[in-house]
Amino acid sequence: MVHYRNRYLNYIRRKPLALLAPITLLVVIYFYFFSAHGFSSNKQKYNYNKKSRGWFYKNRDTVILKDLPKNHISHYDLNKLTASKDALNKREEVLILTPMSKFLPEYWENINKLTYDHSLISLGFIFPRTTQGDDALKELENALKKTKREKRLNFKKITILRQDSNSLQSQLEKDRHAFKVQKERRSMMALARNSLVFSTILPSTSWVLWLDADIVETPVTLIQDLTGHNKPVVSANVHQRFINQDTKQPDIRPYDFNNWVESEEGLKLAASLPDDEIIVEGYSEMVTHRALMAHFYDPKGDPSTEMTLDGVGGGAVMVKADVHRDGAMFPSFPFYHLIETEGFAKMAKRLGYEVYGLPNYLVFHYNE
């Protein structure tokens, strides 16, 4: 019998399993935790084969997948998604988007009167991080609760966002429409619109309706009417009700001057401006002589009459969702000397889409 002076060697010789057991355990632990990383260079980055239900993998998979549904990979075939003139009969989904700095009950009631199937309509709102924005958000939440209590809240989905960008502190009409703040204001609005649309659009969305929070009266068939034109971008004509001081009678007047057709004067003005300057329509400080759709309204005309446009406002604009998916957004920077909704129209046209307006189809803006 061989006897070593070192008592540890003698112990190992008598009981070899005392050493082999911990070494084996360490090897198993090493391969369990580190083998995937050690040999990753010889494997594909992603492996979609179902993992073994062996002892080593069972617990790890359970931890990772316990909160996921069984079929946690969703497949969408957008080639089958339609945006047609027969939207309602084809059950096409509509996303109504509204940047909101103040809440008007008339806006909310008008939305709820729309006759398009509410189960096919999703709503999206974005609020500025201001005191007015806080107040508007609370009022909308109260309106939602009231409508729900009355069992009239049947929309597919409602998303409410808060801006992570700046906004004007004052939302009074005279302040937000002042010429000197237009570039800053509309740049902020563009950021808000982009956040809203790209946070809420779904694979099932066929149409996006941009509806300003100040639009308080539309035909109840607004969605059917606009989608019925089957255009990539189509804008209603925004007017405003008021009391005519001359006749002392209720009257209407043009309101949104951002729906326009480009002019030679407008092109010359753009060519004379520095790259970072924008043209703002509807102000005496910048005369463009563009044809404004607001002035083309004919009370006796056909509401379905169309005209091609080069710029649009944001009052009531129906957009095929694929226009946004293809990259048309609201530039927060001068884009061919245009910004926000007018810049969006330019971008859509640069992508190959046509933009239309309906001069005899009226929606009405709130009168402050």
Swiss-Prot record:
Q: How does it sit in the membrane?
A: Single-pass type II membrane protein
Recorded hits in Pfam families, A to Z, give:
Anp1 (PF03452)
- Name the gene for this chain: MNN9
BP GO terms, sorted? cell wall mannoprotein biosynthetic process; cellular response to heat; filamentous growth; filamentous growth of a population of unicellular organisms in response to biotic stimulus; filamentous growth of a population of unicellular organisms in response to heat; fungal-type cell wall organization; protein N-linked glycosylation; protein N-linked glycosylation via asparagine
Q: Where in the cell is it found?
A: Golgi apparatus membrane
Q: Name one GO molecular function term.
A: alpha-1,6-mannosyltransferase activity
Which Gene3D superfamilies does the record associate with it? Spore Coat Polysaccharide Biosynthesis Protein SpsA, Chain A
Side of membrane Cytoplasmic, spans: 1-15
Instruction: Tell me where the transmembrane regions lie.
Output: 16-33
This protein is called what?
Answer: Mannan polymerase complex subunit MNN9
Q: Which family does it belong to?
A: Belongs to the ANP1/MMN9/VAN1 family.
Q: What does this protein do?
A: Required for the addition of the long alpha 1,6-mannose backbone of N-linked glycans on cell wall and periplasmic proteins.
Q: Which residues lie on this side of the membrane: Lumenal?
A: 34-368
- Keyword vocabulary terms for this entry: Golgi apparatus, Membrane, Signal-anchor, Transmembrane, Transmembrane helix
Q: What is the lineage of its organism?
A: Eukaryota, Fungi, Dikarya, Ascomycota, Saccharomycotina
Give the pathway listed in the UniProt entry for this protein.
Protein modification; protein glycosylation
One GO cellular-component annotation of the UniProt record comes to: mannan polymerase II complex
- Matching InterPro entries: Mannan_Polymerase_Subunit, Nucleotide-diphossugar_trans
